């Protein structure tokens, strides 16, 4: 059974090296676990969608909650799915500082990434629009 999970977290260290480390680890681990998804980051905040088998997604989310690089981890949305929306990426990435501010304003009160202030469904809609507008990079 496929599931999709969205979560938000604050990054402890927002240096490019830390972001690269997280993405590299994801891209190494995810293919062997059948995980796909997207990571959007900006202003020290992560918004991530993870898709895959229920056990694999649950295990990965458990690891993320314990990962010292993340704090304030919050589950935004969880659902059973019939197909993946982010199946083309072992972990696609979006740097929110490079996104057209009109896209962010469409889904939030301010032109910044803040999944803590919107619903999980709104966060999912934002990620889907970022995918549709080719804002996602890192097709590994």
Language model features with spans:
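Charge-rich, low-complexity N-terminal segments
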Residues: 1-140
């Amino acid at each position: 059974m496929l599931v999709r999970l969205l979560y938000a977290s604050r990054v402890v260290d927002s240096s490019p090296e830390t972001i690269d480390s997280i993405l590299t680890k994801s891209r190494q681990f995810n293919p062997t676990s059948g995980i796909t998804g997207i990571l959007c980051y900006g202003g020290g905040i992560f918004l991530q969608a993870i898709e895959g088998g229920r056990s694999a997604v649950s295990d990965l989310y458990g690891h993320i909650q314990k990962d010292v690089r993340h704090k304030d981890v919050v589950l935004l949305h969880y659902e059973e799915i019939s197909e993946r929306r982010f199946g083309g990426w072992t972990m696609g990435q979006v740097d929110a500082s490079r996104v057209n501010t009109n896209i962010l304003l469409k889904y939030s009160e301010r032109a910044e990434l803040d999944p803590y202030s919107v619903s999980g469904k709104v966060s999912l809609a934002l990620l889907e629009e970022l995918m549709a507008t080719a804002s996602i990079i890192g097709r590994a």
